């Protein structure tokens, strides 16, 4: 599974990229909203992990562009942020497929929780889309 990780914080981007790669995912990265759109259109990711506070274009703007473009509208987008419940619900209404609380994923004692959380999200997204459990692409 190819994941586009959109995160402007270089240390956090490196940490999460490494954790996802160790879990068996192929990872491509973008550090701002504009490059996220370019990589989503040309990099053919299976899923996008999208931070909300980005330079050049905000996460919500990126989400709106992704969901209005025929080339990217069907790519699942998982929001990574620490937004309020109201803002989270608005993003889901605008097309985000799921949400991961950034603070809950912070490495604890050297353990990055993103790969495990992502597997749960992928299962939820596939259930919503009617994909049978046996066809869920989970890497271990």
Residues of each region from the PLM?
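Conserved acidic carboxylate
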Residues: 7
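CheY-like receiver
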Residues: 107, 111, 120-140
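Two-component/phosphorelay signaling modules centered on CheY-like receiver
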Residues: 10-28
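Acidic, metal-coordinating helix/loop segments flanking the phosphotransfer/catalytic sites
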Residues: 29-47
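The feature encodes the CheY-like receiver
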Residues: 55, 73
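Active-site residues of response regulator receiver
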Residues: 51
């Amino acid at each position: 599974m190819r994941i586009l990780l959109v995160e402007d914080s270089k240390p956090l981007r490196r940490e999460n990229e490494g954790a996802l790669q160790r879990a068996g995912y192929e990872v491509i990265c973008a550090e701002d909203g504009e490059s996220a759109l370019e990589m989503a259109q040309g990099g053919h990711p299976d899923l996008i992990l999208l931070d909300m506070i980005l330079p050049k274009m905000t996460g919500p703007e990126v989400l709106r562009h992704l969901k209005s473009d025929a080339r990217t509208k069907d790519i699942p987008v998982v929001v990574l942020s620490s937004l309020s419940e109201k803002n989270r619900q608005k993003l889901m209404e605008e097309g985000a497929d799921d949400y991961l609380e950034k603070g809950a994923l912070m490495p604890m004692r050297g353990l990055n929780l993103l790969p495990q959380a992502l597997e749960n999200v992928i299962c939820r997204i596939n259930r919503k889309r009617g994909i049978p459990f046996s066809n869920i692409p989970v890497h271990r």
